[in-house]
């Protein structure tokens, strides 16, 4: 029995061990740093279009899409090897991006040009895999996006007009738009689609809205730290991390109690976050330090920093916790 238990533990440990590369987007270098997930060393850099900011996995999980804002293009790479698969052009000013859960729609925020584009996802079309279906003119600087689990609603923050917008995905028209706190950035929708968390980069808290009704309602402001910015689920259905770029910290929020339960140091202007499958290791792009910071949640400290390119932004790995 002892031998069997040891084998089971060994198998579990092996399953939890990351095997796929970590990708960090270097926004000012037009490249992607490929990081070894075990040694945490940079293996190589992949060239992209100008200003790659965010990245997202295709519904079939065969491609990781990198949005190149200033090149009006998308770079598709293999999430397991980092090999470039293809480039899609004529995608106007893609800053942030999301796929709908029903795998029908691909949405981008045109940060510089003040609109949100909705594309029909056609993966079997080798010429036009994405066909523009609608364009919603936003206020000033649409920033981050989230889509509900039913694929009916897009939520978008307007960074420079301090607004939050909901868009009907089927009609491609706004449902509502409200004024919120200063410099809203990332938006995180809870798994039940009821609450929307908004990071306020111009303040030091996260605003929480009940979006389950026709009219959204502000129900709480969660004090996190100056420059509340980007979210990432821990993968346990209860906790979400938020980066506080000015405070140089990461806060862990309990989405049931809507309170901060832990805070971690994160030097260098923490921006985007990913969580390894163990649920205990954070990967954080340190925007101002040209580093990828590795944070051990149990130790509550940065245990490693990896040098990357200029202005590191999006960070992602196939071995992240929310896939469990």
Language-model segments: residues:
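Bacterial N-terminal signal peptides
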Residues: 1-10
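Predominantly soluble domains enriched in secretory-pathway, periplasmic, or organellar proteins
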Residues: 11-324
């Amino acid at each position: 029995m002892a031998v069997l238990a040891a084998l089971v533990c060994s198998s579990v440990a092996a399953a939890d061990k990351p095997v796929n590369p970590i990708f960090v987007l270097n926004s000012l270098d037009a490249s992607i740093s490929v990081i070894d997930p075990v040694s945490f060393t940079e293996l190589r850099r992949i060239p992209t279009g100008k200003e790659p900011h965010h990245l997202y996995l295709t519904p079939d999980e065969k491609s990781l899409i990198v949005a190149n804002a200033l090149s009006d293009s998308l770079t598709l790479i293999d999430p397991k090897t980092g090999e470039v698969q293809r480039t899609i052009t004529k995608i106007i000013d893609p800053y942030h991006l999301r796929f709908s859960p029903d795998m029908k729609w691909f949405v981008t925020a045109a940060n510089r040009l003040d609109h949100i584009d909705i594309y029909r996802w056609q993966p079997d079309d080798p010429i036009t895999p994405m066909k523009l279906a609608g364009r919603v003119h936003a206020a000033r600087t649409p920033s981050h996006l989230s889509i509900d689990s039913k694929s009916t609603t897009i939520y978008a923050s307007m960074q420079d007009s301090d607004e939050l917008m909901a868009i009907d995905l089927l009609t491609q028209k706004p449902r509502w738009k409200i004024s919120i706190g200063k410099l809203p950035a990332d938006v995180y929708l809870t798994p039940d689609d009821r609450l929307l968390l908004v990071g306020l980069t111009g303040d030091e808290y996260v605003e929480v809205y009940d979006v389950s009704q026709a009219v959204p309602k502000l129900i709480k402001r969660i004090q996190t730290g100056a420059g509340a910015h980007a979210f990432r689920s821990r993968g346990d259905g209860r906790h979400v991390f938020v980066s506080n770029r000015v405070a140089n910290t990461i806060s862990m929020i309990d989405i049931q109690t809507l309170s901060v339960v832990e805070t971690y140091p994160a030097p260098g202007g923490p921006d985007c976050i990913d969580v390894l499958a163990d649920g205990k290791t954070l990967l954080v792009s340190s925007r101002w330090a040209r580093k990828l910071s590795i944070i051990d949640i149990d130790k509550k400290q940065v245990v490693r920093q990896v040098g990357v390119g200029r202005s590191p932004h999006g960070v992602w790995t196939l071995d992240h916790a929310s896939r469990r």
